[in-house]
UniProtKB/Swiss-Prot annotation:
Name of the protein this chain belongs to: Pyridoxal kinase PdxY
GO biological process, one term: pyridoxal 5'-phosphate salvage
Binding of ATP, residues: D111, E148, K181
HAMAP family: PdxY
Reaction it catalyzes: pyridoxal + ATP = pyridoxal 5'-phosphate + ADP + H(+)
UniProt function note: Pyridoxal kinase involved in the salvage pathway of pyridoxal 5'-phosphate (PLP). Catalyzes the phosphorylation of pyridoxal to PLP.
Family: Belongs to the pyridoxine kinase family. PdxY subfamily.
Subunit structure: Homodimer.
Pathway(s) per entry: Cofactor metabolism; pyridoxal 5'-phosphate salvage; pyridoxal 5'-phosphate from pyridoxal: step 1/1
PANTHER family assigned: PYRIDOXAL KINASE
One Gene Ontology MF term: pyridoxal kinase activity
Amino acid sequence: MKNILSIQSHVVYGYAGNKSATFPMQLLGVDVWALNTVQFSNHTQYGKWKGIVMPKEQIGEIIQGIDEIGELAKCDAVLSGYIGSAEQVTEIVNAFHTVKSRNPNAIYLCDPVMGHPDKGCIVADGVKEGLIKQAMAHADIITPNLVELRELSGLSVENFEQAIEAVKVILTKGPKKVLVKHLSKVGKQADKFEMFFATEEGIWHISRPLYQFDKEPVGVGDLTAGLFLANLLNGKSDIEAFEHTANAVNDVMEVTANSGVYELQIIAAREFILTPRSQYKAIKIV
């Protein structure tokens, strides 16, 4: 069994961060060591919440604790998502290096959550800069959305072709694999949900339905990053992992849309996470 150290947010109510990613990864047969960067009552897009940001020292101390009982070498991957403070970025990078020293084959997937004030996604000052200047260079895989793609590449990215160029730029900055979780308004079709996956071997594009919500569910990117990493650890090829992830997330979104509920319906869609009924295919475009 593969093991993922998942360092991201926790919400008591609803689905975001580790709450959105842990159960789906476990469904795929991967053990998840969840380390929470924050503990909030609910995700920040409600506009109000209670809770705490975990002290930055907690990350290193918890890693040390796992190491001291001789289990850290069993960690196959580190996944980072929503980060509670700029100082935590450094701690997460250090944690990955510690894991890597115990298991040289371990990989790091960075989901570079930078915040989106227009949508109510709020992150602490300095987190964006830390992700760009520190985490990206150490990540084997990075999973930006459109906002994060612009920040990581330093390009404006106003159309499909510029998105391709931005992905190519990121591949020169450290990551070996880039999964763009949502092309948003720079996609080819306004009525579709479109994604990219890129390596040195090329760029693949996948398109699936875009569901309409009164309020967009939160935690979709966390679910996407977790499923992609779990699929890779389970031995799927890059493209198999990309397709399974896109299809499983599509099915979760369809179930959620049909439910009329704001929060992701991960439990209700559990069978489709394991075996997606959707069968959208990735097409190589570069």
